[in-house]
Amino acid sequence: AATQDPKAQRVAGVAGGGAAAPATGGGNIGWGKRIQQAVMTGVSYMIPFVAAGGLLTALGFLIGGYDVAFVSSDVALKFSLWNLPDAQTYQLAGADTLTSHAGLSLYIGAVFAALGSFGMNFLVAALSGYIAFGLAGRPGIAPGFIGGAVSVAVGAGFIGGLVTGILAGLVALWFTTLRPPRWLAGLMPVVIIPLLTTLVVGALMLILLGRPLAAAMTGLQNWLTSMTGASAVLLGIIVG
């Protein structure tokens, strides 16, 4: 028997009744790669908001006319199928202008456009929240979403959403390395870490980072708006 033969081949034992141990060689990922993966996680979770919001807005324009964008929220909230709106007045270039549609088409178009607008309003918050989730897991979601909302409020847009998502994820991840008392451990991922991370990220955005990031976002928008046709084509080739 092999147990009595000193020259018999030995097989390394595995704890747990023969189940193979998981490979750990792929766990040593650098921080740059880890942040890149988290950003891609945020983008992948943001895409459904883009798809739903963009398509609903386009359907609203198709049904209610392009000018439904100026009155969609008011019409959707103030009127109903039993109280259809007349043509609505909105301001365009300082002059009162009537919408091109009225009645059922205006109301349905306004409902679609309003839903699309509500969906698009979540883009930056979703991007930031799920970047933080990609870095820190569940404790990073709330701080990331709140940081994204602050980014929108201060005008930092997508640049701010990227920054707040990464910040929230890294701060929440650091808090998870702490070793609290046993009686506090159950509250850490659902209360303590989200609370402290939100405070850190929100304070940094409102006090320190918000205005510079908003200026960078404004500069980027102005640069893209001022591009000529040839420059736009070149940028498209570079971006791919």
Predicted regions span which residues?
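Signature of multi-pass transmembrane helix bundles
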Residues: 2-240
